[in-house]
C-alpha cells in the first residue's frame, strides 16, 4: 500500500486511466489521418457518367479493378465537370457483376491512348489489422473503464489489495485531550503509544509489546474517537479500515486484503492498524446464515493467523472496536491476539461534566448555565448523547433568534434527545387531556410514595416523540446496581397509570400497553436472571447472550423444562399483581394529592421537580416491605455493622433508578407502540399505546 502520487488537489492520480486515454487519442488520430491521406486522389462518379466518358474521346488511361470492390479508374485528358463541381482528371466509378462484361467491352472500345490494365483489389495490412482489431480494442477499453469505476478508479485488478487508509498527518488532529469521560481507556492507550515510541524501556524489563487492543462498549461511548486520538498522538503510520471492507462478493478477496494490510504495516513498523466494527468479520465461526465455510470465516481465519504470526518485537499493534463483543470468535479474544480488552462504558458524573465542557467550547453559554446540573440530569447518557444535547441546544437557540444558549434551551435539548421532539401540531380533546393527566399523575404519585424510588423530576402532558405525555424519574447520583426492593418499586409505579384508569375511570384503554410490556420485562428478568424469586430459586434460566445472534441460537433447545417455564410465568404474574396492588393502594390513600397534581397539570401542562416536591409534601408513604429471604429455612442476620451506615431493608435508597450492571434489563425507548387494534387511535394518546421507560438513559420515564 505504497502512497500513490497525488494531484495538487490531493486526489490520487490514475496512471492506467492516463495510458488508456493516450491510446484512444492515438487511435482516433490514426483513423483521421487514414481518412484524410489514405485516398489516392480519384473522385467518385456515377456508373452512367463513367460509361459516357468511355464512349467519348477524353479517356487517356483506364484501370479495371476486381476483387472485394469492382470499379474502373480513369485518367482523363481534361477536367470532368459534374454540374458546377469540378471532379478533375482522375475519376472512378463502380459497377456490379451484371455489368461486368459491358464495362470491359466499353474499356476495350474506348482504346485509351496509354492503354488499360486489370488489377485485383487488396487492402493494406495495417488497415486490415485496424479494422479487425478495432472492435476488440473498443470492447476491452469499455470493460477496463467499467472495472476502474467499480473499484474506485486506478485499481482495476487490485481486488485483493487492502482498502485501509493511512492517517494524514496534515489533517486536523484529535488528541487525548479531546477525549473525556474515559480516563482508564486513555491511560491504557497512552501506554500503547509509549510502547511504540520507546520499546526499549519495556523490553529492558522483559515486557512484550501487546499484539492487540479491543475497545468494546455501547454505541456512542467514544471507541472510534479514542482510535482517532491514538492516530493523532502516535508519530507512527496509522492504518484505519472498517471490518466490512474486508468482505466482498469475490471469494478470497477478504483474506488477501488481510495479508496485504498486515504486510504493509510490517514493512512500515512501528505501526498501528485500526479495524472499526470488527464484529462484521470477526463473529463466531460456525454460526450465522452463511454456514461454516463462507468468505467471512476465511477472512477471519487469515486474520487469526496474521495476529498470531507477529514476531516478538514486530512493533505492530492492532486496535479494534465493537459494540457486540459477545458474538466475537473466542479464538480472536484469547491472549496473544487481543492481549488487552478495554471496556468503554457510559461516563459517570465527572466524565459527563468533562464531556460537556469539551463540547461546550465555542458555544456562547449564559452566565447562569450550570453544566454540572446538566450532567446530573443526564445520567446514563453516552458521550454522543451529550454532544447531541449541546448541539440541539445551539440549534434551538439559533432557531429562536437568540445569541446565547440558556437553561431553557438546554432543558428542551435534554428532552429532545431523551424523548424526541415535541409535537406542537397534535390536538387532544379535553377528555384525552384529562385521561393523560390522571395517567401520568398516577405514575408520579406512586413513584413519590415508594420508599426506594428515585425522585420524580418532571411530569408533562405535552406530546413528545411517540408519547402523549411522560413522567421522568431520575436518580440523583450514579448507581452500579439495584436492589430487589428498588426493582419492585419500579414495577409499582409502572403500574400506576393502569391502576388510575381502572380505579377512577372504571375502564382501561390501550394506552398502558407499553407499561405492561416494560413491567413484564423487568419482572421476567428478576425471575430468570437475578434469582429474586423464592419459588423459581437462585438460577439463571436465560442464555449467556442478552441479544440474539441469528444462527447461533438456531437449533438450540430451551435450557429449562416446560414445567419451569410455566412456573416462571406464574411468578412473573404474581410480581405484577403485587405491583398493581401496591399502586392501587397508593392511589386510594392519596386521592386528594392525585387530584391536586392533575389540576396543576391541566393548568400548566408541565411540572418541574420543585413544583412536584411542593405537591407531594402530603403524600402518605407506603410501609416498608417485609424482609425478603429466598427460603424461610435460612435465618436472617443483623444489618451490617462494618463499613458504613445502612438503613433497614425496605428503605435502602432514595436514589434508585440506575440500570443494573453489568447486565441490566434492557428497557424499550419511552413511548413504545401499543397493540394494533382496528379502529383504535395510536401514538400515545388515550386509546393508543405509548407508556414507556427510558432505561437506556438511566432514567425511568413513563410516557402516555
Curated annotation (Swiss-Prot):
Subcellular location as annotated: Cell membrane
Gene Ontology BP annotations: protein catabolic process; proteolysis
GO function terms (MF aspect): ATP binding; ATP hydrolysis activity; ATP-dependent peptidase activity; metalloendopeptidase activity; zinc ion binding
Binding positions for Zn(2+) per the UniProt entry: 439, 443, 515
Active site (UniProt): 440
Source organism: Brachybacterium faecium (strain ATCC 43885 / DSM 4810 / JCM 11609 / LMG 19847 / NBRC 14762 / NCIMB 9860 / 6-10)
Keyword DNA-binding: no
Protein EC: 3.4.24.-
Name the record gives this protein: ATP-dependent zinc metalloprotease FtsH
Residue intervals annotated with topology Cytoplasmic: 1-17, 149-704
SUPFAM superfamilies: FtsH protease domain-like, P-loop containing nucleoside triphosphate hydrolases
Entry similarity comment: In the central section; belongs to the AAA ATPase family. In the C-terminal section; belongs to the peptidase M41 family.
Listed CDD domains: RecA-like_FtsH (cd19501)
Keywords: ATP-binding, Cell membrane, Hydrolase, Membrane, Metal-binding, Metalloprotease, Nucleotide-binding, Protease, Transmembrane, Transmembrane helix, Zinc
Membrane topology: Multi-pass membrane protein
Amino acids binding ATP: 217-224
Cofactor section: Zn(2+)
Gene that specifies this protein: ftsH
